[in-house]
Amino acid sequence: MTQSLEFDQTFGFIAKVLQMIGYPSCLAPYPTTFASRLKSSAGFVVCFLMLTYCVFGQIINIGLLMMGHRQTDQVVEEVAIQVSSTGFCIIGLAKMYSLSYNRAILSWLIADFRVKWNAGELTDKDRSIRDGTLRPTVAITTVAALGNIIMVSAFNFQPVVEMIYGRVVTGEWVKLFPYVIWFPFNSTHGAIYYLVYLFEVYSGVIVAVGNVGFNCIFCLLTSHLSMQLKLLCSWIEDMVEVEDEKGVQSKKKLYRIVRYHQDLIRGRNALQSMFSTTLFLNFSASSVLMCMQLYLITTAGITLMVKFTLFMLCILMEIFILCYYGEEILANSSSIAAGAFNSNWYQSKVSQQNPRFGKNLIPIIQQGQRPMVLTAWKFWPITIRTFSAILQTSWSYFTLLKTVMH
């Protein structure tokens, strides 16, 4: 028999991943004082400032490229590479800011879901629904986190491979960096080179962990909400008991269901408040980033093609997973109205003893007919249809860019 899943196991891995960039454990209580919050987030603040400088340095470098102050034979390709890297860093910066700014909301959501997870009245059927929903999500978020770590490792250590290859072929060391960032000093001089290289390597880790940490937190929270919606639908369908001739137990279940449904609506509103703006930026930028990657894949050599393809796949996986879990909330909230109607309230003695029982179901049915939809800044519903729209937009941008360049 499979061991029951513990609540802390659902967030445990991603909490440890986020601690790599100094983010306090999302499973820990929210600090009550400003001093304690600042102390627990000191490492995260340092990482945020490091990534902020990387964005600043890359923007300056793009400006130098476009003004012709940097010598290169392929200006368009270099600018595309820089824009892709800078865009990804800006998204990571926005997600890190969102995690920090909304830490109180995150703590409240996790505490609320923990109480519901450990509720004593859950049956074996309820626990089966609970574990069956969350186990795949934990596995998916783990794979997504590892995939992003592999991607950033490829970016971080590709220059090392190129330098070794150049040494073997030409007999000379040519100092390279993972990313092209402007510094107000000679970054290739002596020991400074190694310090700058380490700075860029860790900055790559910061942006990857910031991105995937935000995404995984979103997926886990939405999966918890989807699971609660599945439980609610199951309770609604089993609400009416045939043996309950006076309808006492059925009425108690109905009142519990109404309160539970209201709690889930508040949870959905908290998720919307926490993720809406950042996901709008993410979806908007991803269309441009995927366009850039498609262009670079068609123009780059074999070595760079592998790197750009890996980057492209990570972006695709990220957007698909976000939209998939948004779709899950839409689908499970839509089933509530059908569950209320299928509870057989009209065939039982409950409706005969208490004619108002059926009328009390009307608000649940009406609310269920307005499904919960998470949106990216009230512009994009977070659904599979939006994922398809982003792909179509990216392809349109790519074909336009190819036409202009040729």
Swiss-Prot record:
Membrane protein topology class: Multi-pass membrane protein
Transmembrane segments: 44-64, 79-99, 137-157, 168-188, 277-297, 302-322, 371-391
Molecular function GO labels: odorant binding; olfactory receptor activity
Mutagenesis / variant outcome for changing residue 402 to R: In allele C, allele D, allele E, allele F and allele G
A single cellular component GO annotation: plasma membrane
Variant or mutagenesis effect after changing residue 8 to E: In allele C, allele D and allele G
Localisation per UniProt entry: Membrane
Membrane topology (Extracellular): 65-78, 158-167, 298-301, 392-406
Biological processes annotated in GO: signal transduction
Main location: membrane
Effect listed in the UniProt record for changing residue 331 to V: In allele C, allele D, allele E and allele F
Residue ranges annotated as Cytoplasmic topological domain: 1-43, 100-136, 189-276, 323-370
Keywords, alphabetical: Membrane, Olfaction, Receptor, Sensory transduction, Transducer, Transmembrane, Transmembrane helix
Pfam family, one: 7tm_6
PANTHER family: ODORANT RECEPTOR, ODORANT RECEPTOR 13A-RELATED
Function (record text): Odorant receptor that specifically recognizes the human odorant sulcatone (6-methylhept-5-en-2-onesul), a volatile odorant emitted at uniquely high levels in humans, thereby playing a key role in mosquito's preference in biting human compared to other animals.
Descriptive protein name: Odorant receptor 4
Protein species of origin: Aedes aegypti
